[in-house]
């Protein structure tokens, strides 16, 4: 069965286990303090810090080595993985996933898909991919479904302030 990886910006932490989706966290930085999104800082803690901390948070992509570790772990269960990432235009996460794919060689087949979005625009296709994997769809079919669906998905955000 195809395994699905989504980065933490997809905001599906509560559904990931149910759908057998592996999450890879981006790093959240408040000044010199670094946290793994959804692992060492919860969304609730993040939003509280956003209001109370004078330092503007930044993010950084997972290192290729983090993807390599996850690919190797999943390769013990499958020989096919699909990875959905935050937009390559917003983060280096997509590039890290591609570098890791090269680093593992022929250990397993990995397809990295740029969602060209974040938040629900990334999380919903990841859930759709996981459902397709569970029913036995091939990696090729899942990637084709994602490439068909992603251009038709829109995500909107509203901010109190910039």
Could you describe each region identified by the protein language model?
Residues 3-63:
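N-terminal glycine-rich anion-binding loop in soluble enzyme alpha/beta folds
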Residues 9-10, 28, 86, 115-117:
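Short, ordered loop/turn segments at secondary-structure junctions
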Residues 51, 126-134:
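Regular secondary-structure segments
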Residues 52-96, 143, 150-151:
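Glycine-rich phosphate- or other oxyanion-binding loops that anchor nucleotides, phosphorylated ligands
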Residues 80-87, 111-114, 128:
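Short glycine-rich or small-residue beta-strand-to-loop segments that form or flank ligand, phosphate
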Residues 85-105, 123-127:
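Short Gly/Thr/Asp-enriched flexible loops that form oxyanion-binding sites at enzyme active sites
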Residues 101-121, 134, 138-143:
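Short, acidic/small-residue loops that bind anionic groups at enzyme active sites
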Residues 131-162:
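Internal, active-site/partner-interface "lid" segment
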């Amino acid at each position: 069965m195809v395994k699905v990886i989504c980065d933490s910006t997809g905001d599906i932490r509560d559904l990931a286990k149910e759908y057998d989706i592996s999450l890879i966290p981006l790093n959240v930085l408040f000044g010199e303090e670094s946290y793994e999104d959804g692992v060492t800082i919860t969304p609730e803690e993040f939003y509280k810090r956003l209001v109370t901390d004078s330092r503007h948070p930044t993010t950084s992509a997972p290192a290729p080595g983090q993807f390599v570790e996850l690919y190797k772990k999943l390769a013990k269960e499958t020989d096919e993985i699909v990875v959905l990432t935050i937009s390559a235009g917003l983060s280096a996460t997509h590039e890290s996933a591609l570098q890791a794919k090269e680093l593992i060689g022929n250990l397993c087949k990995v397809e990295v898909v740029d969602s060209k979005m974040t938040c629900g625009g990334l999380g919903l296709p990841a859930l759709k991919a996981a459902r397709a994997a569970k029913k036995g769809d091939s990696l090729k079919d899942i990637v084709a479904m994602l490439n068909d669906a992603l251009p038709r998905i829109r995500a909107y955000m509203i901010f109190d302030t910039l």
